[in-house]
């Protein structure tokens, strides 16, 4: 659906989180490589609790998280140490990470601070063993351009990445320490964004600047976008964990729609003098129920929602309703979700049970009833959370942190964090960053233009190479005299083809690729031999390029040997050549290449085949 965003007063901002590609982590000497859970050498468990800030305040988001009793298990590896486990003080801030972050700050036109103080940001969802994340304000007051106007950069922080969530189970969560401590920059814009398309363009621009350094990690999960959205009369909502730039405009548009619907629901509820009753134990109502979910529960708690009839089931985002919002809050406290009378009778709940439920809580026809079926403790806390969210629905749109879903919608996570979650880190001394020696890199957009004008690549191939992960290999290959088009085609297309054919491309080192390209340039390997040579190297990475060429029988042959092979093919097909002349070319070319593939350049084969056919035509 299209909206008049100016009329609605849309205000949006971004937070971009990007991992840096450094040798070691931010506060220890462990490598930044990722590991598989089965590679863990041991595990340990922790319980986390919120602590007060230096002003004696508790952060609301941390406090809510702590109300959910969960055990956190951590997987340790032979590439992690006691710093990640919070059993050893952090080391000094990593110099490589600091230098890369300052380079990014320069590209964002930010001012680097005179002194950077490491802070502790309270996080009790288990993703940090210490219960806090170390974060450093490094730069402020930048700006980027978009087609719809400038977007100011509020700040850029250098911080440690959280632990990787491996598995969530009934009692808690399992995390991997391999990701914890990887250097990360967090870039926050000011609320200058006014449309969903501008939000996406701003994110793309920041992403391009980050990749221009050549010093950020690539791949799924290495960059995350958070989007802050509000409309006039609505509320600020932070949506976390957007993995793809393609999702940003849909996410913003759907959040605008959600807030519009919630405001309309709130107005209707106030017109109905809506209210929320007290939760009640209604377990007896369902003693003989045929609903499997309810029958298996220890306790059933319900709450009357005065004036809510027909509104709990109202859609506020694609396939998500007000009831889904209530359910999200119940789930945060361990329940599987909720039932509500806008969708009952259903799920094994009979009409008679619905009427008995209404009688038990004193609901009339204008009211709705929500219920939770779970263990006693869970049911009691979950129904309280549902009641609180229903109270908020009467007021309008709540400020909150939400998680981005893959379909462009979002789900409730927790309240918005406040300033009470930050306090100084006393184990790490402040640093005085000096950006005077920073030399800003060539932007990827400029690199694309140069590849076209100086190296003769077409626009599509130039962009593929410039934005691709093998851009540094391409630059080195060209510096070593390799033909740019050959290098670009190999790195942008050939490797993709091999990956689709299930070749273990990840086994190929940069030197493998460069050596194969140099053999082609030297005439020791025809272009048709690139694929089989790389396949051989991927199967056995211990080989050199020269050894792989020899093992695969790909060594180039001289022109006369090619001619002999061509003549042999023609003589085998003499009748066809006599009857069709050059019309036989295509079929004979395929036969020749089948015999010479990987040993002779296709252009040479084609040239000699034409010559020999013409002699006989």
Swiss-Prot record:
It holds the Pfam family GAD. GO terms for molecular function: aminoacyl-tRNA ligase activity; ATP binding; glutaminyl-tRNA synthase (glutamine-hydrolyzing) activity. Gene3D superfamilies: 1.10.10.410, GAD-like domain, GatB domain, N-terminal subdomain. It comes from the Archaea. Keywords: ATP-binding, Ligase, Nucleotide-binding, Protein biosynthesis. It is an enzyme of class 6 (ligase). One of its GO terms (cellular component) is cytoplasm. Its EC number is 6.3.5.-. SUPFAM superfamilies: GAD domain-like (SSF55261), GatB/YqeY motif (SSF89095), Glutamine synthetase/guanido kinase (SSF55931). One of its GO terms (biological process) is glutaminyl-tRNAGln biosynthesis via transamidation. It catalyses: L-glutamyl-tRNA(Gln) + L-glutamine + ATP + H2O = L-glutaminyl-tRNA(Gln) + L-glutamate + ADP + phosphate + H(+). Signal peptide: none annotated. Belongs to the GatB/GatE family. GatE subfamily. Heterodimer of GatD and GatE. Allows the formation of correctly charged Gln-tRNA(Gln) through the transamidation of misacylated Glu-tRNA(Gln) in organisms which lack glutaminyl-tRNA synthetase. The reaction takes place in the presence of glutamine and ATP through an activated gamma-phospho-Glu-tRNA(Gln). The GatDE system is specific for glutamate and does not act on aspartate. PANTHER family: GLUTAMYL-TRNA GLN AMIDOTRANSFERASE SUBUNIT B MITOCHONDRIAL AND PROKARYOTIC PET112-RELATED, GLUTAMYL-TRNA(GLN) AMIDOTRANSFERASE SUBUNIT E. This is Glutamyl-tRNA(Gln) amidotransferase subunit E. It comes from Natronomonas pharaonis (strain ATCC 35678 / DSM 2160 / CIP 103997 / JCM 8858 / NBRC 14720 / NCIMB 2260 / Gabara) (Halobacterium pharaonis).
């Amino acid at each position: 659906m299209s909206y008049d965003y100016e009329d609605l007063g849309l205000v949006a901002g971004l937070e971009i989180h990007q991992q840096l590609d450094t040798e070691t982590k931010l506060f220890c000497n462990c490598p930044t490589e990722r590991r598989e859970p089965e590679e863990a050498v041991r595990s340990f468990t922790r319980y986390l609790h919120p602590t007060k800030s230096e002003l004696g305040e508790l952060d609301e988001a941390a406090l809510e998280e702590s109300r959910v009793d969960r055990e956190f298990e951590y997987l340790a590896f032979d590439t992690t140490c006691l710093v990640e486990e919070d059993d050893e003080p952090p080391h000094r801030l990593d110099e490589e990470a600091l230098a890369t972050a300052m380079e990014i700050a320069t590209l964002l036109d930010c001012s680097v601070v005179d002194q950077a103080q490491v802070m502790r940001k309270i996080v009790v969802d288990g993703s940090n063993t210490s219960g806090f994340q170390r974060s450093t304000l490094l730069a402020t007051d930048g700006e980027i351009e978009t087609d719809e106007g400038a977007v100011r950069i509020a700040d850029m922080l250098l911080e440690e990445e959280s632990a990787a969530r491996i598995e969530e189970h009934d009692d808690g969560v399992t995390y991997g320490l391999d990701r914890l401590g990887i250097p990360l920059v967090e870039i926050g814009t000011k609320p200058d964004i006014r449309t969903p398309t501008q939000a996406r363009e701003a994110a793309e621009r920041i992403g391009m600047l980050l990749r221009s350094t050549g010093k950020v990690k690539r791949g799924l999960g290495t960059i995350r976008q958070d989007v802050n959205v509000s409309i006039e009369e609505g509320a600020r909502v932070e949506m976390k964990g957007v993995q793809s730039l393609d999702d940003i405009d849909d996410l913003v548009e759907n959040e605008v729609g959600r807030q519009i619907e919630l405001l309309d629901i709130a107005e209707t509820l106030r017109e109905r003098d809506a209210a929320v009753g007290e939760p009640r134990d209604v377990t007896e109502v369902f003693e003989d129920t045929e609903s499997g979910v309810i029958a298996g529960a220890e306790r059933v708690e319900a709450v009357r929602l005065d004036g809510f009839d027909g509104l709990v089931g109202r859609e506020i985002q694609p396939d998500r309703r007000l009831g889904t919002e209530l359910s999200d809050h119940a789930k945060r406290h361990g329940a599987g979700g909720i039932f509500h009378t806008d969708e009952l009778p259903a799920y094994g709940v009979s009409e008679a049970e619905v009427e008995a439920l209404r009688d038990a809580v004193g609901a009339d026809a204008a009211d709705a009833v929500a219920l939770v079926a779970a263990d006693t403790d869970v049911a009691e806390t979950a129904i309280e959370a549902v009641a609180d969210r229903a109270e908020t629905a009467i007021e309008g749109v709540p400020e909150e942190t939400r998680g981005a879903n893959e379909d462009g919608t979002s789900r409730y996570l927790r309240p918005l964090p406040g300033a009470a979650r930050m306090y100084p880190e006393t184990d790490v001394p402040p640093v005085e960053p000096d950006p005077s020696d920073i030399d800003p890199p060539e932007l990827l957009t400029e690199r694309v233009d140069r590849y076209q004008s100086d190296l003769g690549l077409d626009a599509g191939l130039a962009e593929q190479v410039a934005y691709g992960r093998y851009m540094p290999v391409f630059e080195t290959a060209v510096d070593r005299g390799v033909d740019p088009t050959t290098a670009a085609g190999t790195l942008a297309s050939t490797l993709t083809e091999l990956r689709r054919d299930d070749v273990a491309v990840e086994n190929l080192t940069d030197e493998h690729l460069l050596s194969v390209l140099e053999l082609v340039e030297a005439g020791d390997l025809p272009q048709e031999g690139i694929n089989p040579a790389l396949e051989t190297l991927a199967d056995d990475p211990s080989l050199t390029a020269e050894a792989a060429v020899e093992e695969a029988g790909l060594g180039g042959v001289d022109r006369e040997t090619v001619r002999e092979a061509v003549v042999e093919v023609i003589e085998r097909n003499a009748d066809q050549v006599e009857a069709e002349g050059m019309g036989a070319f295509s079929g004979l070319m395929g036969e020749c290449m089948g015999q010479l593939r990987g040993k002779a350049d296709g252009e040479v084969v084609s040239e000699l085949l034409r010559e020999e056919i013409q002699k006989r035509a």
